[in-house]
Swiss-Prot record:
InterPro entries per UniProt: Oxidoreductase_gamma_subunit, PorC_KorC, Pyruvate_synthase_PorC, Pyrv/ketoisovalerate_OxRed_cat, Pyrv_flavodox_OxRed_cen
Name the record gives this protein: Pyruvate synthase subunit PorC
Keyword Oxidoreductase included in the entry's annotation: yes
pH dependence: Optimum pH is 10.0.
UniProt temperature dependence: Optimum temperature is 80 degrees Celsius.
Gene: porC
Oxidoreductase as UniProt keyword: yes
Matches recorded under Gene3D superfamilies: Pyruvate-ferredoxin oxidoreductase, PFOR, domain III
UniProt cross-references to SUPFAM superfamilies, sorted A to Z: Pyruvate-ferredoxin oxidoreductase, PFOR, domain III (SSF53323)
Quaternary structure annotation from Swiss-Prot or TrEMBL: Heterotetramer of one alpha, one beta, one delta and one gamma chain.
Length: 177
């Protein structure tokens, strides 16, 4: 079973990202689940969300404590929350940052999701960009399923723009090695 933990701030779309990822995995023929964890529920407060993906039915019904992957939508959270907490020894972190970031604790992939979102969406909402990057890094979900679910979640022009932003991030990460 693959377990993913998303870190974001209220209003950034971490919960929606976890749900879209689970639906895309289901679209690819896998079992999946997604759920949020809220502390103080207010815009800007740290939020976690979780996705599990498996080839067999998932019986677990609790938050992810030892993720295989951590997706950080806001690099400022690295200084506020222990995003590496419980990360498996061979775990991977995907971090939204325009800069570089290294850690002795994890393999880290970075992408300027905010820049891609601003260029393609006109807003710094990075959830779909990070999902495209996640698909490119991991191959856990197909980009076609991800784009289909993004367009179902956000109909019309907004969905098209989010799908394109996800595809750009996917291509960037898929070819980054």
């Amino acid at each position: 079973m693959i377990e993913i933990r998303f870190h974001g701030r209220g209003g950034q779309g971490a919960v929606t990202a976890a749900e879209i990822l689970a639906k895309a995995a289901f679209e690819d023929g896998k079992y999946s689940q997604a759920f949020p964890f809220f502390g103080v529920e207010r815009r800007g407060a740290p939020v976690m969300a979780f996705t599990r993906i498996n080839d067999e039915p998932i019986r677990r019904r609790y938050q992810v404590y030892n993720p295989d992957y951590v997706v950080v939508l806001d690099e400022g959270l690295v200084d506020v929350v222990d995003v590496f907490s419980g990360l498996k020894e061979d775990g991977v972190v995907l971090l939204n940052t325009a800069g570089t970031f290294t850690s002795e604790n994890a393999k880290i992939h970075t992408i300027d999701a905010t820049g891609i979102a601003l260029e393609n969406l006109g807003r710094p909402i990075v959830n779909t960009v990070m999902l495209g990057a996640f698909a490119g890094v991991t191959g856990l979900v197909s980009i076609d399923s991800l784009i289909k679910i993004i367009k179902e979640t956000f109909p019309g022009k907004i969905g098209d723009k989010n799908a394109e932003a996800a595809r750009i991030a996917y291509e960037k990460m898929k070819h980054s090695g």
